[in-house]
Amino acid sequence: MLFWLTENVLALYSSRFNIVCHLTFRAIISFLSALFISLGIGHCVITWFHNLCFFQIVRCDGPKSHTQKQSTPTMGGIVLILSIVISVMVCADLSNIYVWYVFFILITYGILGLTDDILKIKKKSSKGLSVLHKYFWQSLIALTLVIIIFMSDRSLTSTQLIVPFFKNFMPQLGIWYIFLAYFVVVGTSNAVNLSDGLDGLAIMPIMFVAAGLAVVAWISNDIHFASHLNIPYICFSGELIIICSAIIGAGLGFLWFNTYPAQIFMGDVGSLSLGGTLGIIAVLLHQECLLLIMGGMFVIETLSVILQVIYFRLFGQRIFKMAPIHHHFELKGCPEPRIIVRFWIISLMLVFVGLITLKIRQ
């Protein structure tokens, strides 16, 4: 909206307004607007959800310390989605198809997560949608979008797999790229969902990964930098910086209320939608493998669950006291704030490692 207004109206009166069209300026405005919207509506949503008794449902087999969280409102992801959508609508070039691809995942996965949260509240149970139903809708949404993206760009570079540390090894996946992209979107969505188990644990790594993807989008949008690092030049990728900036701003505002002890939780409406959003951004940038590194904290959490289930079914014993792994550390007596901050540090380090791989390639 701001981009269109400047290009078509304000620039006619003075060339000074052209600064508004600059990507860096719009990214800053996107960040600030999402931050202040999140801060502005956060307290209102907390009060409203308190009055409606939209409280977090705590697992009966979880750590005993979590019983005090039962009076904490959930579904705070609505704040995140609203903040991101409004700021992106204001700051982004809405003629860019990538913006609408991301919106599609953000909103549809948000609706899916909202449905799951509402069912949990109605049932007064930690189980909302069945795993089968949730996975079906996640898959249908992701496959629909991925096929549209695949059909709209049939160039050779569109199905290349960029492998970290290897400069000239870019295998062509062809139609198999659809399944890779699908796996990245659905997998990231579920991985973030699994990681959202402690106050502020998931939102900070989400911001870190969004910042890393913003750097990659900036490089991909510059033909000289992209050529220098031997990664695809993607002319539409600039607007993804606006979206990533909005995610960071909205996340920072949400963290104001979500930090320990949390006043509100993001719920599935937040974790599923933001996880899927990070996944689709990585797909649009052709950096699926890089996301595995930068989002390594989410990968670790997911692997801990997979290993726990497989090992228990094979041997009848558990590797961890409880999965995901952050609960294991809780049950071992580690204070919740310490676990959270240490996971943040690990996540930040992995984002830096991911960005370094863009340069260290043979």
Swiss-Prot record:
GO terms for biological process: cell division; cell wall organization; peptidoglycan biosynthetic process; regulation of cell shape. It is found in: Cell inner membrane. GO terms for molecular function: metal ion binding; phospho-N-acetylmuramoyl-pentapeptide-transferase activity; UDP-N-acetylmuramoyl-L-alanyl-D-glutamyl-meso-2,6-diaminopimelyl-D-alanyl-D-alanine:undecaprenyl-phosphate transferase activity. CDD domains: GT_MraY (cd06852). Keywords: Cell cycle, Cell division, Cell inner membrane, Cell membrane, Cell shape, Cell wall biogenesis/degradation, Magnesium, Membrane, Metal-binding, Peptidoglycan synthesis, Transferase, Transmembrane, Transmembrane helix. It is a multi-pass membrane protein. Its cofactor is Mg(2+). Pfam families: Glycos_transf_4. Its main location: membrane. The chain crosses the membrane at residues 28-48, 72-92, 94-114, 131-151, 169-189, 200-220, 236-256, 264-284, 290-310, 339-359. Coiled coil: none annotated. The keyword Plastid does not apply. InterPro entries: Glycosyl_transferase_4 (IPR000715), PNAcMuramoyl-5peptid_Trfase (IPR003524), PNAcMuramoyl-5peptid_Trfase_CS (IPR018480). PANTHER family: PHOSPHO-N-ACETYLMURAMOYL-PENTAPEPTIDE-TRANSFERASE (PTHR22926), PHOSPHO-N-ACETYLMURAMOYL-PENTAPEPTIDE-TRANSFERASE HOMOLOG (PTHR22926:SF5). Catalyzes the initial step of the lipid cycle reactions in the biosynthesis of the cell wall peptidoglycan: transfers peptidoglycan precursor phospho-MurNAc-pentapeptide from UDP-MurNAc-pentapeptide onto the lipid carrier undecaprenyl phosphate, yielding undecaprenyl-pyrophosphoryl-MurNAc-pentapeptide, known as lipid I. Belongs to the glycosyltransferase 4 family. MraY subfamily. NCBIfam families: mraY. This is Phospho-N-acetylmuramoyl-pentapeptide-transferase. It comes from Blochmanniella pennsylvanica (strain BPEN).
